[in-house]
């Protein structure tokens, strides 16, 4: 079997990463080893934890403002144009299913008057920037009148403050 020069270099680079103390090797979904820098893995853990704390803070803030808040566990299938149940993510190392994969993160209800409620979707983003797919989902939710508004919660200018932006 003849191996090309570029393929050989890539194989040697992967071998070097696997033996290095700087990299952590894990197995991907297709059974192929994936090398990640340990510093990036640590940074990802910190970012994910900070995002979870910020989500909890936003939820408490909305509840303090008199809104009923619940985790939204649905998502939009843009190809079929319908609301579907969000897929659970399985973590084989912790032997558990992660539920929080819906878009937006929360559904918020507030009584307005007899037989009238404000139904708002709340997406929590530390920087307040939505991806292209998330923007398309927001447009779909509003067009189909699933939510009356969609708020994007982001960190405010002052330490500890939260800003809500209308989509």
What are these regions (language model features)?
Residues 2-167:
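Catalytic phosphate/metal-binding cores of nucleic-acid and nucleotide-processing enzymes, i.e., regions
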């Amino acid at each position: 079997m003849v191996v090309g020069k570029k393929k050989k270099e890539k194989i040697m680079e992967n071998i070097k990463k696997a033996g290095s103390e700087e990299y952590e090797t894990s197995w991907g979904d297709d059974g192929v080893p994936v090398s990640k820098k340990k510093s990036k893995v640590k940074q990802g853990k910190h970012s994910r934890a900070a995002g979870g704390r910020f989500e909890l803070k936003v939820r408490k803030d909305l509840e303090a403002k008199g809104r009923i808040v619940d985790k939204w566990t649905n998502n939009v299938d843009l190809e079929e144009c319908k609301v579907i149940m969000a897929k659970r993510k399985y973590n084989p190392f912790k032997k558990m299913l992660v539920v929080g994969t819906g878009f937006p993160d929360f559904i918020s209800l507030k009584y307005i008057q007899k037989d009238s409620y404000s139904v708002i979707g709340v997406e929590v983003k530390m920087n307040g920037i939505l991806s292209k797919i998330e923007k398309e989902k927001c447009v779909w939710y509003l067009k189909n009148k699933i939510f009356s508004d969609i708020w994007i919660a982001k960190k405010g200018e002052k330490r500890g403050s939260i800003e809500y932006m209308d989509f």
